[in-house]
Amino acid sequence: MRTKHVVVLPYDEKWKQDFEDIKNELVEVLGDFAIAIEHVGSTSVEGLAAKPIIDIDVVVKASDVKRAIEALESIGYIHEGNLGIEGREAFAYEGKEHLQTHHLYVCPENSAELKRHLAFRDYLRSHHDAKEKYGNSKLEAAKLYPEDIDKYIEYKSPVIEEIYAAMKMKFN
């Protein structure tokens, strides 16, 4: 069991600005080789309860992944590899106390993981019932398992699988 305090909050309009603040810092270092900087994950879906952590996918050409890693390392991000998920490179960070807590990934533009993130986000944005069901499962999971991230994830997984089935996507 990984012990990690789980906090899920009602949607906060501030998360949009938190994303923009982080994005602005990323744009400065990545310049024009970042094809897009996408706000993904639950904080990107208006009205959805979420852990207050901004998920960000930096989209680059496959040939620019190494360049993006080096640029991000130059401003304090720590490359962690793909953490077992093909199609993305994950980053931790130090010295970013001025920014909202966030998870940062670099994804090649044709990555299946990027497509999955965007499709899930867009589906929840356009399907109120799915958004409500998912949000409720997250709130309930956090209430039941406030100190166990693995149980939290396990509890909400059937709802995620149901959403992927409705989207006709395979859930890993």
Regions found by a protein language model. Name each.
Residues 77-112:
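Conserved catalytic core of two-metal-ion nucleotidyltransferases
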Residues 46-48, 70, 93-97:
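Short, conserved, surface-exposed binding loops centered on an aromatic residue
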Residues 34, 76-77:
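Short glycine-aromatic motifs
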Residues 68-76:
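Short amphipathic alpha-helices in soluble, non-transmembrane regions
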Residues 1-38, 161, 172:
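Helical scaffold of the NTase/Pol beta-like nucleotidyltransferase catalytic core
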Residues 26-67:
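Active-site nucleotide-donor binding segment shared across nucleotidyl transfer reactions
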Residues 114-172:
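Catalytic cores of NTP-dependent nucleotidyl/adenyl transfer enzymes across multiple folds
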Residues 6-13, 57, 120-124:
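Short histidine-centered catalytic/ligand-binding loop motif
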